[in-house]
Each structure stands twice: as C-alpha cells, then as structure tokens.
UniProtKB/Swiss-Prot annotation:
UniProt motif (Switch 1) ranges: 31-45
Species of provenance: Homo sapiens
Molecular-function annotations in GO: GDP binding; GTP binding; GTPase activity
InterPro entries: P-loop_NTPase, Rab, Sigma_54_int_dom_ATP-bd_1, Small_GTP-bd, Small_GTPase
Keyword Transmembrane: no
Any one annotated GO CC term: endoplasmic reticulum tubular network
Quaternary structure note: Interacts (in GTP-bound form) with ZFYVE1. Interacts with ZW10 and this interaction is enhanced in the presence of ZFYVE1. Interacts with BSCL2. (Microbial infection) Interacts with Hepatitis C virus (HCV) non-structural protein 5A; this interaction may promote the association of NS5A and other viral replicase components with lipid droplets.
Modified residues (N-acetylmethionine): 1
UniProt-recorded name of the protein: Ras-related protein Rab-18
Originating gene: RAB18
Protein function: The small GTPases Rab are key regulators of intracellular membrane trafficking, from the formation of transport vesicles to their fusion with membranes. Rabs cycle between an inactive GDP-bound form and an active GTP-bound form that is able to recruit to membranes different sets of downstream effectors directly responsible for vesicle formation, movement, tethering and fusion. RAB18 is required for the localization of ZFYVE1 to lipid droplets and for its function in mediating the formation of endoplasmic reticulum-lipid droplets (ER-LD) contacts.
Tissues showing expression: Ubiquitous.
A single BP term in Gene Ontology: lipid droplet organization
Pathological condition linked to this protein in its record: Warburg micro syndrome 3: A rare syndrome characterized by microcephaly, microphthalmia, microcornia, congenital cataracts, optic atrophy, cortical dysplasia, in particular corpus callosum hypoplasia, severe intellectual disability, spastic diplegia, and hypogonadism.
Free-text activity regulation comment from the record: Regulated by guanine nucleotide exchange factor (GEF) RAB3GAP1-RAB3GAP2 complex at the cis-Golgi membrane which promotes the exchange of bound GDP for free GTP. Regulated by GTPase activating protein (GAP) TBC1D20 at the ER membrane which increases the GTP hydrolysis activity. Inhibited by GDP dissociation inhibitors (GDIs) which prevent Rab-GDP dissociation.
C-alpha cells in the first residue's frame, strides 16, 4: 500500500443487467462512455485512488453481472466489501421493483453489518423516465441508504456517488480501521463547521 493511502476499500456495483453498472464504473475510473458497451460476463474489476476530505483511499471496485445465471458466483464477491452501489435504471421500472431482491442477496452474503450502501438512479439523461426521483429517495430512506441520481453518459452525479460513499465509509472506522492498525495511518478530519458531504450536499446522506 502506498504510504499516503489511508486504506484500500472493496466496493461493489450491483443491480439488474442493462442498468449501466459498467458505464458508471468506466465513467468514474477512465472518464469514458461507450453507448455500445456489452453486458458484463461474470465480473469486471477496476482500481482507482481518490482523495476525500484529505484522506486518500484506494478503491477496488467490482462490477458484478446482473444476469440471473451468474447469481451463484456472487457470494465470494460480497465477502469483505465495505461499500455497495446499487443501481437501477430510471427509465425501466422493472429494475427499480427488483431492488428488494438485491438487498435480500446483500443481506444474505455480506459479511459486515455496518456496510455502507448507495442507491443510484442511472440514465437521467433520457426523457422516458418511469421512476420518479422521490420514489428513489423514499426507497433509500426506508433502507438507510445514501441516494443520488446520475448519468454515466453526461457524467452527472457519478463522481459524487463514489466520493460520498467513500466519505461515509471513512466516517465508519469499524469498516476499515482494523486493517490499518499496524500501518500508522491517521484519519484526517474535516474542519469543524464544514458540512454538506463530499459533493456539497448533492447526495442525500440517510
């Protein structure tokens, strides 16, 4: 681990096939967008280091497949994760309806009780919306999740989603602290009075 890196975090991106998980990942890690991106088979894996509130964290981001036939592969992917981004497509209500199934799977396979979950409504650049923002916000509040709407195509909300998730994880020392006890790392604290989250309150911290 780099000396100035506070911790390495395992982040999962889950949700139904076609909601834009891979597009969100590539926009965040490589700042690219491919409208013809093929569905992920199995899992994709990216690493990116970011700085939030003066704390540098290395993210190991796992993009899990949404197809039902790959569900049997997921238990090992959930193991040890500190954060999860659960994605639905705001233009496809069926992907929103199935969020409960993903939460049940997360509860079944996740090895941590204090894992941080972020709900992302993707594809807000499209006009044929089927899921209102307030519906997403209500669902997130019900399940104590962070929430944001985003567009991998236009980049709206993408950086914020990851930064807000990482900020919340860092604020939950039990998620990562034990792995760094012998490394002499220190958490940098935001100056008193500074608030609104990593993105100035753009995300809802619930």
């Amino acid at each position: 681990m780099d000396e100035d890196v506070l911790t390495t975090l395992k982040i999962l991106i889950i949700g139904e096939s076609g909601v834009g998980k891979s597009s969100l990942l590539l926009r965040f890690t490589d700042d690219t967008f491919d409208p013809e991106l093929a569905a992920t088979i199995g899992v994709d894996f990216k690493v990116k280091t970011i700085s939030v509130d003066g704390n540098k964290a290395k993210l190991a981001i796992w993009d899990t497949a949404g197809q039902e036939r790959f569900r049997t592969l997921t238990p090992s992917y959930y193991r040890g994760a500190q954060g999860v981004i659960l994605v639905y497509d705001v233009t496809r209500r069926d992907t929103f309806v199935k969020l409960d199934n993903w939460l049940n799977e997360l509860e079944t396979y996740c090895t941590r009780n204090d894992i941080v979950n972020m709900l992302v409504g993707n594809k807000i650049d499209k006009e044929n919306r089927e899921v209102d923002r307030n519906e997403g916000l209500k669902f997130a509040r019900k399940h104590s999740m962070l929430f944001i709407e985003a567009s991998a195509k236009t980049c709206d909300g993408v950086q914020c989603a990851f930064e807000e998730l990482v900020e919340k994880i860092i604020q939950t020392p039990g998620l990562w602290e034990s792995e760094n006890q012998n490394k002499g790392v220190k958490l940098s604290h935001r100056e008193e009075g500074q608030g609104g989250g990593a993105c100035g309150g753009y995300c809802s911290v619930l």
